[in-house]
């Protein structure tokens, strides 16, 4: 995997210790079991998905390595349920996205037990103060950090390096169940194709107007 490659490269450059390398390898070995447990959250997530069906828009926030997960969550919600959604880096919220927050806006917040957890929680407080409904997706050990969240989805504790992998699972389940509750076709989303059709570039094609 890319993570294993990055770990090997970091070790070769003397950037991590042998102990840290072994910790990461052990965490990778345990990841399939954690994903399996997280896939059992359908019943917990279904009520949240039902509440999202009435929303016109939603905001996804993630800081540091969880920013791409926020983008993925927003994309999946748009693709499957046709609800407008945007993903942003939590630390950038003050520079524009905060203007989108209004009373009752669903804010799906991604939080890991890492060095930026405190800052991320502070960003979420600002969203709450402006009327945002916080749906927190986090590890079990970090759930109490945001005690003002309206709803909390917890996954097993995981190494911070692997948090994006594990937190992506409930984000995708939420999008899937929201679409299911709305009655949209999750297998054939509107206007989307599962394959890409492209024109082969040839000298003849280049001459066409």
What is each stretch, according to the model?
Residues 76, 169, 204-205:
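Hydrophobic transmembrane-helix microenvironments that flank and shape a buried ionizable site
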Residues 201-209:
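Single conserved hydrophobic/aromatic residue that forms the stacking wall/gate
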Residues 71-75, 121-124, 128, 207:
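Residues within alpha-helical segments
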